[in-house]
């Protein structure tokens, strides 16, 4: 199982390849705001752990294992952003909140959050009911 740091790299590499068709060390460093030498070290570790294949000066490709986990990590991130929107978290806080919790939730918890997102999205009245509860709670606290 990858560490949280490894997950961040795999997720970013997956997104870059999906967007551009490739992921270079410099692109990964820029996206994660880290030094290229840090990326090289992590990419070598990910290669050793068979999440990707890295050839110096030639680039990298995700293995089947890397693609599978990358897809799941992107799904997790997107799902948590959806969940935050449903529960009414301010848009400007969503990204940082998701980054803060995504590595600490089990896949079972992610699946249950997925069920909850699906439940709310199946009927807009449910979201409105939640908003009503939130407004009532805000009025009580003021």
From Swiss-Prot:
Matches recorded under SUPFAM superfamilies: Iron-dependent repressor protein, dimerization domain (SSF47979), Winged helix' DNA-binding domain (SSF46785)
Assigned GO CC terms: cytoplasm
InterPro entries to which the protein is assigned, alphabetical: DtxR_MntR_Metal-Reg, Fe_dep_repressor, Fe_dep_repressor_sf, HTH_DTXR, HTH_tscrpt_reg_MntR, Iron_dep_repressor, WH-like_DNA-bd_sf, WH_DNA-bd_sf
Disulphide linkage map: none
Binding site for Mn(2+) 2: 11, 77, 99, 102
PROSITE patterns per the UniProt record, alphabetical: HTH_DTXR
Domain HTH dtxR-type span(s) in chain numbering: 1-63
Binding site for Mn(2+) 1: 8, 99, 102-103
Any one GO molecular-function label of the UniProt entry: protein dimerization activity
Alphabetically ordered keywords of this record: Activator, Cytoplasm, DNA-binding, Manganese, Metal-binding, Repressor, Transcription, Transcription regulation
One of the protein's GO biological processes: intracellular manganese ion homeostasis
UniProt KW Transcription keyword: yes
Localization (cell): Cytoplasm
Domain of life: Bacteria
Record comment: activity regulation: DNA binding is strongly activated by Mn(2+).
Family: Belongs to the DtxR/MntR family.
Oligomer status and interactors: Homodimer.
Protein task: Central regulator of manganese homeostasis.
Protein name as catalogued: HTH-type transcriptional regulator MntR
């Amino acid at each position: 199982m990858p560490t949280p740091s490894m997950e961040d790299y795999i997720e970013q590499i997956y997104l870059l390849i999906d967007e551009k068709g490739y992921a270079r060390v410099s692109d990964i460093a820029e996206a994660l705001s880290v030094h290229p030498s840090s990326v090289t070290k992590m990419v070598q570790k990910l290669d050793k752990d068979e999440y990707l294949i890295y050839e110096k000066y030639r680039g990298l490709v995700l293995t089947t294992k890397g693609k599978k986990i990358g897809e799941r990590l992107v799904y997790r991130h997107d799902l948590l952003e959806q969940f935050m929107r449903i529960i009414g978290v301010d848009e400007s806080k969503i990204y940082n909140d998701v980054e803060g919790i995504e590595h600490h939730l089990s896949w079972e918890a992610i699946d249950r959050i997925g069920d909850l997102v699906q439940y709310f999205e199946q009927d807009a009245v449910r979201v409105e009911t939640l908003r009503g509860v939130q407004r009532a709670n805000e009025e009580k606290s003021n």
